[in-house]
């Protein structure tokens, strides 16, 4: 009998790095644009950025829901134990072979993972 891990957390570090890179661009832009300003103005800019990213995330979540992509990658973190659908290609192909019109396809997996990447990036802000 073999021992099976209850949780596969191996893609977590890669997902955190992707989220950090996504968050770094708007954060650096906001801090660069507001350099030399008072702290309260910097905080206001950070709040506006966070509100914008949250609204953007809600809109992309609606797109994810309307395209029925919520189960494109059914596990968390990652997609079938990988940080992106590229590594989960064989698992997605197997799921499509079993259920061609089912909830798992390559396009749906990418939509779901982009939604997750955006959320991780917003969480870093």
Q: What kind of region is each of these model predictions?
A:
Residues 34-44:
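Membrane-interface helix-boundary motifs at transmembrane edges
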Residues 114-118:
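Hydrophobic alpha-helical transmembrane segments of multi-pass membrane proteins
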Residues 13-32:
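Hydrophobic core of alpha-helical transmembrane segments in multi-pass integral membrane proteins
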Residues 1-11:
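Short, strongly hydrophobic alpha-helical membrane anchors
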Residues 1-3, 66-113:
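Extracytosolic (periplasmic/ER-lumenal) interhelical loops and adjacent juxtamembrane/interface segments
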Residues 46-68:
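N-terminal signal-anchor transmembrane alpha helix
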Residues 123-125:
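Conserved small/polar residues in nucleotide/adenosyl-binding loops
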Residues 32-36, 107-108:
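Cytosolic juxtamembrane amphipathic/interface segments immediately preceding
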